[in-house]
Amino acid sequence: MRKNLTEIVFILDRSGSMSGLEADTIGGFNSMIEKQKKENGEALISTVLFDNVSEVIHDRVPVQKVEPMTDNDYSVRGCTALLDAIGGAIHHIGNVHKYARNEDVPEHTLFVITTDGMENASRRYDSEKVKKMIERQKEKYGSVSYTHLR
């Protein structure tokens, strides 16, 4: 494991029910990025925006290179495919870690999920499958954390 390297995956709900919360979501993301830039060590940032589809806007970008999010980046629309977004992000990051040299796997991985609502549109993943994926990642890498913000 690579000491002093943290992988942070933001999964941000942009479904229609987030209408009126755009400024809070953007401000919260930007605040967390600015705080992370001041921390010791390195951080890689991935950001997934989701409604009924997921869009990756950062894929393992060094935190120092992440620009502030704007309302051009984040606008609400669609339904809430929460489980598809979480499952897809875990699958992607899990594969990156699986095929990386051990010395390149981050010491810590944190998934930060911001949503206001309940699942209503996922087609690829269900709650049981996502729970199993989370447990498998925790068993394999140990230092994987999930934070759900509402």
Where is each model-derived feature located?
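Arginine/glycine-rich "motif VI" loop of SF2 helicases in the C-terminal RecA-like domain
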Residues: 37-38, 135-141
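Phosphate/oxyanion-binding active-site loops and adjacent basic polyanion-contact surfaces
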Residues: 21-25, 78-87, 122, 126
